């Protein structure tokens, strides 16, 4: 079994640090349980998807520290961190993780506001005459 693997995931402004160790299924997110921090079942399923590829979810303990961004950004950042931690544990499932898109860092970020415009792309009203 594994001693401990640590990995980081990012999405927009959200940064997540995930510690994966063998245990009995205890998941700690910023000092709270997974159900308290991420109340929606969809969010929890998204986060735990890479761990399900290893098999038994309850044979691992997770300690997650996440900060910045919104809730969905934190969910995707945590999923990426968990997928990287799982990859350190089991190298042979890399192709499966990659096929599911769990190892892909989403590069999209907020576009900066340009001068002479209201927002990043929105201009002031233009009058031809």
Swiss-Prot record:
Keyword Chloroplast included in the entry's annotation: no
Protein's UniProt keywords contain Cell division: no
Annotated keywords: Ribonucleoprotein, Ribosomal protein
GO molecular function, a single term: RNA binding
SUPFAM superfamilies assigned to the protein according to its UniProt record, in alphabetical order: Ribosomal protein S5 domain 2-like
Positions of the UniProt region annotated as Disordered: 98-129
GO biological process: translation
Gene Ontology cellular-component annotations: cytosolic small ribosomal subunit
Bias type Basic residues, positions: 110-129
A Pfam family that the UniProt record links to this protein: Ribosomal_S9
Family, per entry: Belongs to the universal ribosomal protein uS9 family.
NCBIfam families: PRK00132.1
Cited PANTHER family: RIBOSOMAL PROTEIN S9 (PTHR21569), SMALL RIBOSOMAL SUBUNIT PROTEIN US9M (PTHR21569:SF1)
The protein's name: Small ribosomal subunit protein uS9
Organism field: Chlamydia trachomatis serovar L2 (strain ATCC VR-902B / DSM 19102 / 434/Bu)
């Amino acid at each position: 079994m594994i001693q401990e693997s640590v990995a980081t995931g990012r999405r927009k402004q959200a940064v997540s640090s995930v510690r994966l160790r063998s245990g009995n299924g205890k998941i700690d997110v910023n000092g709270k349980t997974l159900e308290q921090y991420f109340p929606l079942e969809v969010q929890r399923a998204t986060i735990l998807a890479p761990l399900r590829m290893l098999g038994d979810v309850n044979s691992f303990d997770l300690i997650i520290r996440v900060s910045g961004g919104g809730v969905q950004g934190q969910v995707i950042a945590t999923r990426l961190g968990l997928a990287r931690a799982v990859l350190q544990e089991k190298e042979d499932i890399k192709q499966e993780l990659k096929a599911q898109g769990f190892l892909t860092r989403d590069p999209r970020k907020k576009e900066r506001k340009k001068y002479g415009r209201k927002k990043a792309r929105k201009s002031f009203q233009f009058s031809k005459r």
